[in-house]
Amino acid sequence: MTALPRRIGMLGGTFDPVHIGHLRGALEVAELLELDELRLTPSARPPHRDMPSVTAEDRLAMVQSAVAGVSPLTVDDRELKRDKPSYTLDTLESMRAELAPRDQLFLLLGWDAFCGLPTWHRWEELLEHCHIVVLQRPDADSESPDAMRNLLAARAVSDPKALKGPGGQITFVWQTPLSVSATQIRQLLASGKSVRFLVPDAVLAYIDARGLYRAPNTDGSS
């Protein structure tokens, strides 16, 4: 009997720190697409963003604590093991090599990241390895950049559940709007305010135990 193709998702990010917006969005997509596994993949040296505020080890530990016991969410640390920029194409190629030919691989991207794809390393090759699932918010600008219009005309599928084959198509998934950002959380922590209910309790405990994101003490006291 032929085994059914596996359905694997990837959500990359700095996760600096991971928060409920990341996690709720990931879980919604995993359930909608009936994924066997959705891998949260922390990036080490993101080419298109500032360097993270805390170490890779801390960011990885926070993501691991956030998804512990939450199926089908898992953590993939391969980008943290590379001594070079975290190019998504390299990660997809590596993941694809581990899967069976018929297995489906889904790359989850936020709207802003999707619109910025033309600036990514060898971005035209991404769809050779995966489907792209764009996480869309009701308040987002829905006008796609000119560079993406021909691609969308050729590859877009309106029903996320209708994606066929191991890769090559693009679809959009509407997200529950949660106005939470890692920047906001870092600012709250730096000002001494609580971020309870913006991050999982296990992540908050980790942040508190290590004093992450706190403003440095400048008053001369120990």
From Swiss-Prot:
GO molecular function, one term: nicotinate-nucleotide adenylyltransferase activity
Keyword NAD listed: yes
UniProt xrefs under CDD domains: NMNAT
Cell division listed as a keyword: no
One Pfam entry name: CTP_transf_like
Gene3D superfamilies tied to this protein: HUPs
E.C. number: 2.7.7.18
Catalytic activity: nicotinate beta-D-ribonucleotide + ATP + H(+) = deamido-NAD(+) + diphosphate
Pathway involvement of the protein, from the record: Cofactor biosynthesis; NAD(+) biosynthesis; deamido-NAD(+) from nicotinate D-ribonucleotide: step 1/1
The entry's keywords: ATP-binding, NAD, Nucleotide-binding, Nucleotidyltransferase, Pyridine nucleotide biosynthesis, Transferase
Domain of life of the source: Bacteria
Family: Belongs to the NadD family.
Function according to Swiss-Prot or TrEMBL: Catalyzes the reversible adenylation of nicotinate mononucleotide (NaMN) to nicotinic acid adenine dinucleotide (NaAD).
Protein name per its UniProtKB record: Probable nicotinate-nucleotide adenylyltransferase
Organism: Pseudomonas syringae pv. syringae (strain B728a)
